[in-house]
Curated annotation (Swiss-Prot):
Belongs to the universal ribosomal protein uL16 family. It comes from the Bacteria. PROSITE patterns: RIBOSOMAL_L16_1, RIBOSOMAL_L16_2. This is Large ribosomal subunit protein uL16. It comes from Azorhizobium caulinodans (strain ATCC 43989 / DSM 5975 / JCM 20966 / LMG 6465 / NBRC 14845 / NCIMB 13405 / ORS 571). NCBIfam families: rplP_bact. Binds 23S rRNA and is also seen to make contacts with the A and possibly P site tRNAs. GO terms for cellular component: cytosolic large ribosomal subunit. GO terms for molecular function: rRNA binding; structural constituent of ribosome; tRNA binding. The keyword RNA-binding applies. Pfam families: Ribosomal_L16 (PF00252). Part of the 50S ribosomal subunit. Keywords: Ribonucleoprotein, Ribosomal protein, RNA-binding, rRNA-binding, tRNA-binding.
Length: 137
């Protein structure tokens, strides 16, 4: 699963996801992509599950690019622990995804296969997404 090799600080504030993505909104690598339509924290496990669904459906043909990286540590306290006594330990990593962000790109497969594969990947994600295609110049 994806996670940073090292970080400056172990824990981060929760924060809020405001506005729309100002970068990563266009296809840069592949012919087809999956664009986020909602703001949400997407976990490393969800990204990995979507990646596996993509590659399995494409039968290892073509190429996949993951355009989001889980760089936010999410902490949680153990179950049945009273409030207070500090913040919990880092539990997993997540990526803050804004609307308009391209999450996955694929290339080297036909349109119908790409649409099916990205639809399967979208089912593994907690947000609404849209299939996008590069416009031929």
């Amino acid at each position: 699963m994806l996670q940073p090799k090292r970080t400056k600080f172990r824990k981060q504030f929760k924060g809020r996801i405001h506005g729309v993505a100002k970068g990563g909104t266009e296809l840069n690598f592949g012919e087809f992509g999956l664009k986020a339509l909602e703001p949400e924290r997407v976990t490393a496990r969800q990204i990995e599950a979507a990646r596996r669904a993509l590659t399995r459906h494409m039968k290892r043909a073509g190429r996949v690019w993951i355009r989001v990286f889980p760089d936010v540590p999410v902490t949680s306290k153990p179950t049945e622990v009273r409030m207070g006594k500090g913040k919990g330990a880092p539990e997993y990593w997540a990526a803050k995804v804004k609307p308009g962000r391209i999450m996955f790109e694929i290339d080297g497969v036909p349109v119908d296969l790409a649409r099916e594969a990205l639809t399967l990947a979208a089912a593994k994600l907690p947000i609404k997404t849209r299939f996008i295609q590069r416009i031929a110049e």
